[in-house]
């Protein structure tokens, strides 16, 4: 062992050793319990950033800790490798997406290994590899056979910059979540997964996720958006057509004074044909259709009268039909009944267009609401009025009564509605999983047979965005034979949303080299579900919801034995610098490579883990990094000075009664074992765990420096030093490995059993208590531990120093707090 801490030499040495010895390869089956620790896999952009370092360092501590606790830990890593950035980079640099992606993977893999992460690299996956996306195509076919996959002509979100369709979940405030371009609306034939079939199960099973943050569950609950109400049918006057609306307030149906349709509602053209309002309505529709959803829902509410009426099925009233910008066709039924007296938006719209207002709910039977006095809609509960047979009913009871009446009369029904829409998976881009479908004039839409998978993604493609799939430009890909009749056919040229790839990768890790199955069910049964999942809260809806959906589908297909993929979820905070998220545009990016080169991977890990609790944002601090580096140097110097004593030390005696400084050293050691174990295994309070290790190191320095070498108990000293190294191992694996070897131990420190504390060693002989006079601390004194209140009071009051503090003052009251303080109230 060198006197100087040469982190570069040490980290290189042990990384090579771990790689050579396959230290982190885990067997699929053994007698040990299993633990599956997984961090969300990265997109191979080419460079790690500090957010990656934080995410993977957190996971690595958990994985190493669980391994030392006696678990077989599955801790894999892979690459979410398909997607638009590869195409955009390829266009910019004139390099094929595959070449760019694989080069980036090689570089980032090297960076991850430099961090000393305990991944089983034998399980590595890349979603762009044929042996991965072959099984993605196979899973598509399973959903297709189950009726959960379909194609339809749909109005979709279109990103003009990315030149592709976006799922609803990928549109944030009317903009593309990836490039921030304003999203447009477009009509296209698209493939969908029927996630709505699982809406209620996805909602119900949120209660099973006790290890998930509440905020994530609330976000999913709101996105699924369950609402109970009724579908009511209004007949169009003078027509066989009808309009169906969904409402959560059927108790207000007698207050309907107008009907509003979405501009893209298919009934609009029929309603206005030949009417005087036709030209005006067409102009309005064309103008609104150019707007984004955000513009439509956030701007002023605008509408236009169609000239048509429908009939309220409850009271026969004529209801004017309007078109409005704020009604979206893909939400609900694309039609909304206007009840201005009891809905604020409807109230404002009615005032703007001088539409009638009908009050049908009073606060109480004797509290009338006059329309001319209304300044806003009355939206609270009350008593139904002007509502025919329902007059006098409390409106909450009225909801059930109206639904029952509607069902009996055949004019409506009770229904549960969801905000969630089916998952749009088609993308008009090249770098993605080809959809395994062919189109035959004779046979129609035909799935590719499983034995013909994978449908290989061609490498020589002109992939510049044109609005059509680049694969259309490869005739040798497009033109094929029909699997059913053998006649000419054409392949589907859209590729799948990359979220399809990332919604099942956690299962592929369980048998990533399997060529016969997407995963070996026996292995999946052993490892699933993921015990600890770690990633950013930005994935709360998209990735996590889709993964939950896939797992439930796979359960129904008999492919897995679990219905939820992730038992526990940790959403780590961001890494900030100068109060802002690191970004090139702000010039505040800190390179992990530079930090590792200057201070070492162990220092980078220690700072990241010590600076803030995992779920909180972390403010980057150069001084904090230097402080972590100084601490590791301090540990190194301590062990270097004691290595010979530690290496030849006897074991702790079970019969020896340790007293004085030796007992205190043992107490510090076992307190650290207890505290670090609690912090790491509980809420992942790594910052306080590291702080406790620092306190233990201080205690060992004190023991070394204040106790002469001949008087030191080498068994106590060795216990303290060895414990420090083991406790440090999950956080700073390289230095811990080197120190373990230097103190005479065989084998890897990471294969050592985790420590258990000795409760007897935690018992203190003395405790320090504060003596207060009128609430102010005047003295701190050591007294025997575990004294009862009366004993402590008498012991302290008999001490000369306390008598001097009281002097000739009159004692009014004495308040003893055992083991902590004695407050003496005097006057």
Curated annotation (Swiss-Prot):
ATP binds at residue 584. It comes from the Bacteria. Pfam families: Anticodon_1, tRNA-synt_1, tRNA-synt_1_2, tRNA-synt_1g. A motif ('KMSKS' region) lies at residues 581-585. InterPro entries: aa-tRNA-synth_I_CS, aa-tRNA-synth_Ia, Leu-tRNA-ligase, Leu_tRNA-synth_edit, M/V/L/I-tRNA-synth_anticd-bd, Methionyl/Leucyl_tRNA_Synth, Rossmann-like_a/b/a_fold, tRNAsynth_Ia_anticodon-bd. GO terms for biological process: leucyl-tRNA aminoacylation. It is an enzyme of class 6 (ligase). A motif ('HIGH' region) lies at residues 42-52. It catalyses: tRNA(Leu) + L-leucine + ATP = L-leucyl-tRNA(Leu) + AMP + diphosphate. Keywords: Aminoacyl-tRNA synthetase, ATP-binding, Cytoplasm, Ligase, Nucleotide-binding, Protein biosynthesis. The keyword Ligase applies. NCBIfam families: leuS_bact (TIGR00396). Belongs to the class-I aminoacyl-tRNA synthetase family. PANTHER family: LEUCINE--TRNA LIGASE, MITOCHONDRIAL, LEUCYL-TRNA SYNTHETASE. This is Leucine--tRNA ligase. It comes from Desulforamulus reducens (strain ATCC BAA-1160 / DSM 100696 / MI-1).
